[in-house]
């Protein structure tokens, strides 16, 4: 994840959400690793967790991207989130999105 390192501070928090798709996908893979398998999270808990791992104060964008790329599942109401048991790999995402 060498390109992603350019977006991490000394505490390994994302300092910006990368614009280039390849690095953005690396960032999503990185953030997905912070969630505990089998645990159900409220939206607020997801935001708190994401806020611990980025500095640009936009958990909604990160949460939405994690959901859209199928790292996180959620109830239709958005009341509960979880780490999907089958995570997409970086290679799968890069093939899909180029």
Regions found by a protein language model. Name each.
Residues 79-84:
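Minor-groove-contacting beta-hairpin "wing" of winged helix-turn-helix DNA-binding domains
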Residues 2-37:
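Short alpha-helical segments that sit at the start of domains
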Residues 35-39, 55-56:
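Short helix-capping/hinge SLiMs at alpha-helix to coil transitions
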Residues 89-98:
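Short, amphipathic alpha-helical interaction segments positioned at domain boundaries
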Residues 23-24, 42, 58:
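Short amphipathic alpha-helical segments
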């Amino acid at each position: 994840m060498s390109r992603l390192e350019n977006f991490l501070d000394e505490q390994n928090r994302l300092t910006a959400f990368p614009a280039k798709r390849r690095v953005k996908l690396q960032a999503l893979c990185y953030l997905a690793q912070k969630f505990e398998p089998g645990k159900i999270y409220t939206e607020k808990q997801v935001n708190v967790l994401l806020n611990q791992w980025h500095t640009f104060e936009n958990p909604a964008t990160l949460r939405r991207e994690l959901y859209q790329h199928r790292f996180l599942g959620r109830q239709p109401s958005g009341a509960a989130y979880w780490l999907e048991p089958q995570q997409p790999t970086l290679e799968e995402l890069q093939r899909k999105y180029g």
